[in-house]
Structures are given as structure tokens and as C-alpha cells.
Amino acid sequence: MQGFISQVLGPVVDVDFNDYLPQINEAIVVNFESEGKKHKLVLEVAAHLGDNRVRTIAMDMTDGLVRGLKAEALGAPISVPVGEKVLGRIFNVTGDLIDEGEEISFDKKWAIHRDPPAFEDQSTKSEIFETGIKVVDLLAPYAKGGKVGLFGGAGVGKTVIIMELIHNVAFKHSGYSVFAGVGERTREGNDLYNEMKESNVLDKVALCYGQMNEPPGARNRIALTGLTMAEYFRDEMGLDVLMFIDNIFRFSQSGSEMSALLGRIPSAVGYQPTLASEMGKFQERITSTKKGSITSVQAVYVPADDLTDPAPATVFAHLDATTVLNRAIAEKGIYPAVDPLDSTSRMLDPNIIGEEHYKVARGVQSVLQKYKDLQDIIAILGMDELSEEDKLVVERARKIEKFLSQPFFVAEVFTGSPGKYISLEDTIAGFKGILEGKYDHLPENAFYMVGNIDEAIAKADKLKG
């Protein structure tokens, strides 16, 4: 099924066929030479222009393409490698290895455009996905097969939390993770790869990168490449997979560029008219089935901190939980710097998590909120002017704040403290004890950077001794 290139407009390429019309999303391959080098360019059909002419989006730079070059339609969408062989390697949007490691052949490949699981195959049970991170499990628990938004500025610890989650899934749930770098900096991708290598989690994760410098087609479709690899682990191997998308905003942004290049009339703020349906199509594939689940953590960049911007607003509609990182908390030296009052989860419901967990979580939030309200009085008049009751609230709040910190496995190199995975039962028991006043006699420093409450008691004895 050969055609030829009739027009090249940046990343948009028109291809003519004589007696064949490729379907939308079908892949077309162009092999050509430019500056003495051989190139293989993959195009994806985006529109039919009539008379067997199709308009395609290029998955790589179109430098060196000329009219009249032969193009071959593959009769199927872009297909990428799947299975255990993909672990520990880096792929681009078309499923080629880009980590300069040894070349291996993949026996299994899946198309990146797939339907979401049928309704009867989906699991409707609401289950908590235990992460081993106290602040997350207690106050904004993740749903198995749910979607989590990770909000935070530069340098507050998004990547460290992502790596800790990958570590805990690998070692505690013996599960796999997939990381899709969607339109982010190449340097960050490189750093992540090296850090994963150092913290021994690389062999449990597959990495797919479509970086900032690539054409919009590659940046948009890389999310589907990563998702397809995760779907294989869920559907064929029956695993609970963790899928990271950094950054989901770039998925919408590249979609808007593609839409403009294809000549579609833009909608609000210049975004593509199909923004909601594209996002819905993608997010619907991330779900739990009766065989396994894909739990996704999506970093969300909010342009100009405007939460009403159509791109982040469309993402919000799909999220089950939000983990908000706060610079003020990081400045206090409390890591992970998760904001206990701003982070939310639909799982925080007594019918799902049980009465005890719900009461402890709400109790913790209420004490922290009271402490926040008293900050101004403390700043102006000092602690001595508070009533005895308020003094107690402040003391407990400071202990809770410190106890929400914990040493991470992936940060052992920097902190020198061994990482801790805290079970949900231990987390609830610890905070319940603080709220009930069982540990009012312990110094607040005993609660800083420890795992469960027993470690805090042991640390207090050490501090006394």
C-alpha cells in the first residue's frame, strides 16, 4: 500500500495514495536519506482530504522530507513493545529503544489506540491502594485503579514522591510501574533515569519519553504508548500497575498544537474543540478490571496558577484524589511536603475506609486547622497568651505535623536515615494515640522523621538518655 508525499508543512505531512485510503490513526512509514544519513519517519493519519489524500501528523522531525518520497501505509496503528522485556528500558513514541543499551527484539507488540475495558469487565469495588506513605494513606488515600493529581511547584519533591511510590509498589506489592514523560525537559528525564538506577528501582519500571523539543505528535501520543504498556501488565498478566504521567497538562497542550496545525477552529483560550473528548478517551482506559488495575499518578502543571484554565479544569473532572505539595511545609524541613489540609480524596468516606480511619483523619485535619487559625495570635502575642486548651491543641498539632514526615527509601542517600514503609493500621494507631493525648509527655522532636509510633517512643527515650 504505497503512496507518495504531496505536501510538507512542518509536522503536518499530506500523503497521496492511488487505490487505497488509510484509516484515521493508521501508521505510515517513510524511509529516506538526508545529509548522508538514513531516516525512518512514522506518520499518523489525522484527516481525510478526499481523492485518496490523507493529512498526517509526524512523530519526529520532518527535516529532509521532500515531495514525491514514497510512503508505505502499515494497515494498522502505531504498535509498541509490551511485556516484561520493556522493564528497565527507555522508549520513544513509536516503541524504539532510546537508552543506548543493547538492542533486543520484542515478540509482543500492541497498538497504542485501544478501546477502554468493557463495562462488564470493570471492577466497581472501591479499594484503598496502600502506599506506605503516612500522610497520603491517612488523609488523602489513593483508590486502586484511581487517578491521582500531583500538584506542586519546582523543587518541592514531586519526583521524590514519584520514585518512592515506584519503590514501594516494586518492593511491597512486587508490582510494576510505567512512567510516561509527556512534553517535559530532557534533563529531568535523564535525572530520573539515573536516580532510579541508583535507588535500584529501574528493573521494575518501563520509561517512555516524548520530550519538550519533539513535535506535538510525539508529545501527545507518548501518553498512549506508556498506557498501552501498562494495559498489557493489567490485562494479560493480571497485575496492579502504577502509571505515572509527567505532565498531563502537556498532553492537552500538544493536542491543541496538533488541532491548530490541522486547521480546526479553536475553542476557549485557543484549546482544541475536542479537548474534553480526547482527555476522556485517554482517562477512561485507566481503570480497574476484574483481572488487575492501573492506578495513575498524574503531575498537573497549572498555567499561571489559574485552576479555571480549560486544560487543568478538564483533568480535575477525572481525578479521584489530589496530593498537593506545599513549599511552606518543605521550608520547615517536613518531607514529604504534602499539604494535609489541601489534599483531598473521594476515598475519605466512612463507608469505604471505615469509621475509625475516617474519625482519625478528620480529627487530625481539625487539630491542624485550629493550629493554623491560632498562628496569627501566636505570632503577635506568643504562646503564653493562649488558654490551656489552645496550648494543648498547638502542642498536639506540632507533633502531628512532625509525625506526618517520614524517611524515604529513595532519599536514604541524602538523609542517611533508612527508609520506612508504614502500614495503614500503624498509621491510624499512631495518630489516634496523639489525638487521645497518650503521647502528650513525649517531646515533639521524637516524632520527626520516624516510621510508626513505637519508633517515636524509642526516639524519645534516646533523647532523654
Curated annotation (Swiss-Prot):
Q: Which reaction does it catalyse?
A: ATP + H2O + 4 H(+)(in) = ADP + phosphate + 5 H(+)(out)
- Asked if the record carries the keyword Heme, the reply is no
- For the ligand (ATP), the binding residues are G152, G153, A154, G155, V156, G157, K158, T159
Is the keyword NAD assigned to this protein?
Answer: no
Which one of the record's GO molecular function terms can you name?
ATP binding
- Where is this gene product found? Cell inner membrane
GO-annotated cellular components: plasma membrane; proton-transporting ATP synthase complex
Q: Which InterPro entries does the protein's record reference? A: AAA+_ATPase, ATP-synt_VA_C, ATP_synth_F1_bsu, ATPase_a/bsu_AS, ATPase_alpha/beta_chains, ATPase_F1/V1/A1_a/bsu_N, ATPase_F1/V1/A1_a/bsu_N_sf, ATPase_F1/V1/A1_a/bsu_nucl-bd
* Bilayer topology: Peripheral membrane protein
State the protein's purpose: Produces ATP from ADP in the presence of a proton gradient across the membrane. The catalytic sites are hosted primarily by the beta subunits.
Describe its partners and assembly state.
F-type ATPases have 2 components, CF(1) - the catalytic core - and CF(0) - the membrane proton channel. CF(1) has five subunits: alpha(3), beta(3), gamma(1), delta(1), epsilon(1). CF(0) has three main subunits: a(1), b(2) and c(9-12). The alpha and beta chains form an alternating ring which encloses part of the gamma chain. CF(1) is attached to CF(0) by a central stalk formed by the gamma and epsilon chains, while a peripheral stalk is formed by the delta and b chains.
Entry protein name: ATP synthase subunit beta
Origin species: Campylobacter jejuni subsp. jejuni serotype O:2 (strain ATCC 700819 / NCTC 11168)
Q: Which gene encodes it?
A: atpD
